Amino acid sequence: MASTVIKNWDNKTWLSSKDYIKSFNKFLLKRIKLDRGSKILDIGCGRGKIIGNLSSKLMLINKPLGIDLTLHKDKDKRIKFKKANALTFLFKNKKKFDLILIKQTIHLFSFKEITKLLNLSKKNLKQGGKIIILSLDTEKNELPTFKLMKIKLKQSLKRDKKILKLITKLYPYKKNRFNFNVKILKNKYLKMIQQRYISTLLPMTNSQIKKGLDEIKHKYKSYIKFKDKLICLTL
C-alpha cells in the first residue's frame, strides 16, 4: 500500500456516524449477496466500523478482516485487524474472500500498484466473489472546500479519472453511485480540516490550513449541508 497515512477520516466524522454506516451497508448489500458464512476483507479499513456493523447485521460466523497501515487503539472489536501493506498481504494470503472492499483507498496507490492490487485481489476471491471499489465522484463532487483545497482536489480527481480508465482496461465492472446527505456543524468540519481528514490536505503547511480555515469560517453559516458522493465499481 502507498505510504500515505490518513489517520482521521473516520474519527468522529459523518463517515463514522451510525446513519452513514447503516446507509452505506444497505447500499453495499444491494451490490452483493452475503450471508453468515461470508468472508470479508476491507483494504484500508481505518477503525473498521463499516465491516464491524456488517458483521453484526449479518451475524457473521467469521470476523471480517480489516487491514490498514495505521493501528487505531479504538478499532472496532467486531473485526479482526491486521496492520499490513495490502500488496504484501494479498501476495502471501492463503484464504479466499467473498468480498474484498476497497473504499476510498485506491487513489493512494500508484498505477502500477493498482494493477497488482486488482490482479492479486482477483486471486484472493472465492468463486463468485466480488471486489467493490469506492472513490470520490469525479464529476459532481460537493465536498466543502477552501480555494487551495479546491485546486488540489480537482488535481486529485483528474488522477481518479485516469484510475477509472485503467480499471476499465483491466476488468469489466458495474458502476453505481452512493450519495449521503451530510449536515455538519461548521466548527466540527473546521476541526476535520485541521486534522487533515482527506489526503488532499496532507501536503499543506500549517499556514495554508490556517488560511483555509478562515475561508471556511466566512464562507459557510453555522451548519454546512452537502451530498457526499461516491462512485462504486463492482468487479
Label each residue range with its predicted role.
Residues 1-36, 49, 53, 132-158, 196:
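Conserved class I S-adenosyl-L-methionine
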Residues 115-127:
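A short glycine-rich, Lys/Arg-flanked "PGG" loop and its adjoining helix->strand segment in the class I
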Residues 156-171:
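Short alpha-helix
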Residues 104-105:
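Short catalytic micro-motifs in class I SAM-dependent methyltransferases
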Residues 174-235:
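Conserved Class I S-adenosyl-L-methionine
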Residues 41, 46-89:
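Class I SAM-dependent methyltransferase SAM/SAH-binding core
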Residues 101:
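A conserved beta-strand element that flanks and buttresses the S-adenosyl-L-methionine
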